Amino acid sequence: MTAPGARLRIIAIGRDSKGPEADLVARYAARLQPRPEVVALPDGTGSPAEIKRREADAILRRLAAEDLVIALDLGGKAPDSAAFAAMLASWRETSRPLAFVIGGAEGLERRIIERADAVLSLGNLTLPHLLARAVLAEQLYRAQCILAGHPYHRAGRP
């Protein structure tokens, strides 16, 4: 998925669950090469502003200077799967470790958006954060298949 030796991480606010969403994340993550590291960070506490600040602090501690950061945020671009695959191909060519960031219930603090190299949205629907992880993992797998010419992605199907 990324250049040889490059890391792929999904950094998400919220506990790791043992439910069906976690099963989906694990299923798609196992199909990815390299297999992504899924980092679950605790939810922040306090007022909404304090929650966002604490969650941003935790995320920033997990990011390295060389990471290519892709933040998932409602205000981001919502590419289709083919466009996402093209973006992934260009990011992979940088040989930088990729870090996809999913915020908590209050969203991502401005510092994370500013640190991001790209800001994407999974669409206008509101998703539970565990489901957002599963959707991201599936789209990463789908992008890998598109780039490899694998028939998993059937573009233009009625």
Swiss-Prot record:
Subunit structure: Homodimer.
Protein's job: Specifically methylates the pseudouridine at position 1915 (m3Psi1915) in 23S rRNA.
GO cellular component, one term: cytoplasm
Keyword Kinase set for record: no
Gene Ontology molecular function: rRNA (pseudouridine-N3-)-methyltransferase activity
Protein name: Ribosomal RNA large subunit methyltransferase H
EC number in record: 2.1.1.177
Organism domain of life: Bacteria
EC category: transferase
SUPFAM superfamilies in the cross-refs: alpha/beta knot
Coiled-coil annotated spans: none
Binding residues for S-adenosyl-L-methionine: 72, 103, 122-127
Family from the record: Belongs to the RNA methyltransferase RlmH family.
HAMAP family from the UniProt entry: 23SrRNA_methyltr_H
Pfam family, one: SPOUT_MTase
Keywords associated with the record: Cytoplasm, Methyltransferase, rRNA processing, S-adenosyl-L-methionine, Transferase
Keyword Aminoacyl-tRNA synthetase: no
Subcellular location, record wording: Cytoplasm
InterPro entries in alphabetical order: Alpha/beta_knot_MTases, RlmH-like, tRNA_m1G_MTases_N
Catalyzed reactions per annotation: pseudouridine(1915) in 23S rRNA + S-adenosyl-L-methionine = N(3)-methylpseudouridine(1915) in 23S rRNA + S-adenosyl-L-homocysteine + H(+)
